[in-house]
């Protein structure tokens, strides 16, 4: 038998080192049937500069083993039968601003008894500044002697492009959103 190691890596300028990410592991092996598939696996969770944590992960009603990891942690399932293929799915965290950079599957066999799958998420936060310059004598003042205009901004962060050669665009770590629109109306300055 061998092992299956799942590791979690976080990149970007706005990650939360205490955030837990959920993984669903489905193990398949020609030798498995409902009677022989294991109900639980021993797991070792490793993290730099901390003592290893030993725990157990049980198979749920869907036949999956559910684990949670923080950035920088690795969970290793022990005593995984040769010939086992692991399909690992990470829950979706895009609503929280985390982009899945990599996903993997892994197989434990006699050639790779210690299989590994690494999962990386990236989260970056930037600053959007809007400047309204009123020129001339026809500026309309509406609130307490202040000019009023509105704006809405739509930033699409799913598809980043490298614009290090382009000036005057908002960037995070030298990159800017591929799709960006700004519409200015009714904002008080």
Task: Enumerate the predicted regions with their spans.
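Solvent-exposed loop/turn and edge beta-strand elements of beta-rich ligand-binding domains
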Residues: 1-189
């Amino acid at each position: 038998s061998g092992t299956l190691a799942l590791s979690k890596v976080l990149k970007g300028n706005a990650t939360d080192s205490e955030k837990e990410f959920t993984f669903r592991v489905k193990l398949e092996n020609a030798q498995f049937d409902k009677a022989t598939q294991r109900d639980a696996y021993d797991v070792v969770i490793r993290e730099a500069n901390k003592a290893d944590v030993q725990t157990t992960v049980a198979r749920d009603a869907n036949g999956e083993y559910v684990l949670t990891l923080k950035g920088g942690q690795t969970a290793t399932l022990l005593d995984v039968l040769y010939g086992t293929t692991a399909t690992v799915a990470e829950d979706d965290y895009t609503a929280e601003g985390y982009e899945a950079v990599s996903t993997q599957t892994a197989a434990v066999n006699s050639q790779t008894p210690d299989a590994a799958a690494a999962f990386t998420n990236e989260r970056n936060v930037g600053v959007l500044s809007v400047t309204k310059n009123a020129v001339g004598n026809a500026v309309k003042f509406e609130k307490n002697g202040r000019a009023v205009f509105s704006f809405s901004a739509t930033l699409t962060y799913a598809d980043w492009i490298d614009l290090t050669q382009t000036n005057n665009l908002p960037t995070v770590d030298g990159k800017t959103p591929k799709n960006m629109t700004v519409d200015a109306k009714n904002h008080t300055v």
